[in-house]
């Protein structure tokens, strides 16, 4: 988003979004359906006086996108889809209050997961950390994308290019696009007050698409503020 948001409004929307996300993560257990996780997310958002941002967005039928294993993103919750031991589940949540949207996601391993999958989750989290660290006033979007791409590829992983991060504010998806690849010093310059979602989407090359997605919001100041 290319304009500044009011600080208190951002704090409220991001707190509600985070509460709903972690409620969904806690509900993610073997034998639980993806629809039940969605129900928990929906109830958490509405109980805080907010509206689920995803419900009805582009026709989406639920409050949370829940993607399991090889599903990339935007998975639709299903009353028949049971979570199993060893699954990895990405839960993506959006909440709107006071006219402002929040957007956050987390990928959780259910019970014991394969060592290579655990490493993928850890590397993706570090990709996010490095992307946040690059979100400094005066840097450019290419600095963020390069930080994510360089770390992922150092492990031989692939970066998904079909989907990118984005600005977020009055609308769920705003300019600028925030790719997970790029070259330092290129792209839109980061300015104080910008609010963006950094969304690393990383996969195991040649072994199916396991794509943990971690989102954050930040404001580009002298140092980034992780909301």
PLM features per residue range, with description:
Residues 1, 50-51, 56, 72, ...:
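Glycine-rich, flexible loop/turn motifs
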Residues 1-7, 12, 217-220, 224-227:
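Single conserved hydrophobic/aromatic residue that forms the stacking wall/gate
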Residues 8-9, 13-47, 109-137, 153, ...:
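Flexible, acidic/His-enriched mid-domain "rim/lid" segments that flank
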Residues 15-105:
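Extended, compositionally biased flexible segments
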Residues 41, 148, 216:
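Aromatic/hydrophobic pocket-lining residues that form π-stacking "cages" and hydrophobic walls in ligand
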Residues 68-100, 176-215, 219:
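Acidic/histidine-enriched ion/cofactor-binding microenvironments in catalytic or ligand-binding pockets
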Residues 93-95, 112, 125, 148, ...:
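Short, structured patches in soluble enzyme cores that scaffold and shape functional sites
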Residues 133, 140-195, 201:
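A contiguous pocket-lining binding segment that forms or flanks enzyme active sites
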């Amino acid at each position: 988003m290319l304009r500044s948001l009011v600080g208190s409004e951002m704090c409220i929307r991001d707190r509600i979004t985070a509460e709903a996300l972690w409620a969904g993560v806690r509900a993610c257990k073997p034998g639980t359906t993806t629809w039940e996780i969605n129900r928990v997310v929906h109830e958490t958002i509405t109980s805080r006086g907010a509206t689920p941002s995803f419900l009805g967005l582009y026709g989406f039928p639920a409050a949370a996108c829940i993607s399991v294993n090889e599903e990339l993103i935007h998975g639709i919750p299903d009353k028949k889809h049971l979570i199993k031991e060893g699954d990895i589940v990405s839960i993506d949540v959006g909440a709107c209050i006071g006219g402002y949207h929040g957007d956050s996601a987390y990928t959780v391993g259910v019970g014991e997961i394969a060592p290579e999958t655990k490493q993928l989750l850890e590397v993706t989290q570090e990709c996010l950390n490095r992307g946040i660290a690059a979100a400094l006033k005066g840097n450019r979007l290419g600095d963020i994308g390069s930080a994510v791409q360089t770390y992922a590829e150092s492990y031989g992983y692939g970066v998904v290019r079909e989907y990118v991060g984005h600005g977020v504010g009055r609308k769920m998806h705003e300019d600028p696009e925030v790719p997970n690849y790029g070259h330092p010093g290129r792209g839109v310059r980061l300015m104080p007050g910008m609010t963006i979602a950094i969304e690393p989407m990383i996969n195991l090359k040649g072994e199916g698409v396991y794509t943990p997605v971690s989102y954050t919001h930040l404001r580009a100041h002298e140092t980034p503020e992780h909301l």
